[in-house]
């Protein structure tokens, strides 16, 4: 027995030595191969891209479902520290990037965004009655809150070279049969959603319609059509600490510029999507908390840069998840404000308060609509080509200085005597009365569906 064991033992060092040599050769060969691959990839990337000082970050977007890959931002989230901006940028590639932007026959025939407002006192306008919509928001119900001049409800948008498709609620429901229509964005997009619900609900029996409680996602349901008209509160499109639909007035605005995970998990299965974002970027700066950051450290950038990152993350989701033959995506351009009457009435000192008629000056453009931001948005949308249709509300809404609630709405905070003596000081010249301008935005959506 001992002799057999000795013979086996004497053969083991030789076999072991051969095994070690083979493994060592394989490791060295693979390391060299990996180095060559990395070198080739780096050279290839450098050839594809101009030299840049930026680090490009792939957006964190879901392909199936939101799995909670990182701590979700909420209104209690804080920056433990704020450091200098690292220069990271959102890098995304549309797998079908070579497609040109397609123009429909309708768009070739007529630009429905170029036109004028025509007063229409017929029974056709307004398209719905404020008092007959049980889902009306007190923020938009101007007549209920004391506005006596109702001419703002009777202005009809008339394109220069053609007619806008006439609104028909039954036809719209047929387009939506078996589908989910979802508005995603801020309070202006919520106003458009409320307008759409008010336009549609009148033809549905009361016992065949329902509205879910106000939440991150709020849903109006029409049973007979097996259809929903929904609103998702996502004012910055990417994840942020302002994503609570009620408690979102915070002194410090924090976003994850590389993540639409939380919101996209709600919107990804909708059939028709209407996005907007702009108002919440109208401040000096925003803080960035990247998905890879685990210690609560933030970077600070100008809001315009933050918006561009958010648009790029959103664009990456659209590029990789939208088949325009199966899902329709619309982007609504910026909604203008009318904070300074001197812009349309030189020498005056006021805002939209007391205004009763639209601006008549052709191509009027106020300071409430930022042209560099429009150009940035256009750049993103052009890359997406036919995957996104644009509803350009900006110019046509610029004329409507008379369409805002001003003082005729519910204010959530009590007003002191000094402010009450000066109505212009607390006038809302950002949102829009309903019925009113948002109905035309929805008429444009109906036109393109």
Curated annotation (Swiss-Prot):
Please give the GO cellular component terms listed in this UniProt entry.
Answer: Golgi apparatus; membrane
Record InterPro entries: TBL (IPR029962), TBL_C (IPR026057), TBL_N (IPR025846)
Q: Coiled-coil annotation: which residues?
A: none
Q: Where in the cell is it found?
A: Membrane
Extra info from the record?
Answer: Contains 2 motifs that are conserved in esterases, but it is unlikely that this protein belongs to the catalytically active pectin esterases.
The UniProt family comment states: Belongs to the PC-esterase family. TBL subfamily.
Question: What is the protein's given name?
Answer: Protein trichome birefringence-like 35
User: Can you name the source organism?
Assistant: Arabidopsis thaliana
């Amino acid at each position: 027995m001992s002799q057999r064991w000795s013979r086996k033992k004497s053969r083991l060092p030789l076999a072991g030595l051969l095994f070690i040599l083979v493994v060592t050769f394989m490791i060295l060969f693979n390391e060299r191969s990996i180095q060559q691959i990395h070198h080739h990839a780096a050279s290839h990337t450098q050839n594809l891209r101009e030299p840049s000082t930026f680090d490009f970050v792939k957006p964190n977007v879901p392909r199936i479902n939101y799995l909670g890959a990182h701590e979700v931002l909420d209104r209690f989230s804080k920056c433990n520290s704020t450091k200098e901006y690292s220069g990271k940028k959102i890098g995304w590639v549309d797998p079908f990037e070579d497609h040109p932007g397609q123009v429909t026959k309708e768009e070739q025939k007529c630009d429905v965004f170029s036109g004028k407002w025509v007063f229409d006192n017929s029974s056709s306008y307004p398209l719905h009655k404020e008092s007959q919509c049980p889902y009306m928001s007190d923020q938009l119900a101007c007549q209920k809150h004391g506005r006596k001049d109702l001419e703002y409800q009777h202005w009809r948008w008339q394109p220069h070279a053609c007619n806008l498709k006439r609104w028909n609620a039954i036809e719209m429901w047929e387009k939506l049969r078996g589908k989910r229509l979802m508005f995603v964005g801020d309070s202006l997009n919520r106003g458009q959603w409320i307008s759409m619900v008010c336009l549609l609900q009148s033809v549905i029996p009361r016992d065949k319609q329902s509205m879910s409680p106000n939440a991150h996602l709020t849903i109006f349901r029409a049973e007979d059509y097996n259809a929903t008209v929904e609103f998702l509160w996502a004012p910055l499109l990417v994840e942020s600490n302002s994503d609570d639909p009620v408690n979102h007035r915070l002194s410090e605005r924090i976003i994850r510029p590389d993540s639409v995970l939380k919101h996209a998990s709600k919107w990804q299965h909708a059939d028709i999507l209407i996005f907007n974002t702009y108002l919440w970027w109208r401040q000096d700066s925003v803080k960035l908390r990247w998905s890879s950051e685990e210690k609560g450290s933030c970077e600070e950038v100008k809001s315009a840069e933050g918006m561009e990152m958010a648009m790029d993350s959103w664009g990456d989701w659209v590029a990789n998840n939208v088949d325009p033959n199966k899902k329709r995506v619309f982007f609504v351009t910026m909604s203008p404000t009318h904070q300074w009457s001197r812009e349309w009435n030189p020498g005056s000192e006021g805002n939209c308060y007391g205004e009763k008629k639209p601006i008549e000056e052709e191509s009027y453009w106020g300071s409430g609509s930022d042209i560099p931001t429009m150009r940035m948005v256009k750049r993103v949308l052009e890359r997406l080509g036919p995957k996104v249709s644009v509803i350009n509300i900006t110019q046509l809404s610029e004329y409507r200085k008379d369409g805002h609630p001003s003082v005729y709405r519910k204010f959530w905070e009590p007003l002191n005597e000094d402010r009450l003596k000066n109505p212009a000081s607390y006038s809302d010249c950002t949102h829009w009365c309903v019925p009113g301008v948002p109905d035309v935005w929805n008429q444009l959506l109906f036109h393109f569906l």
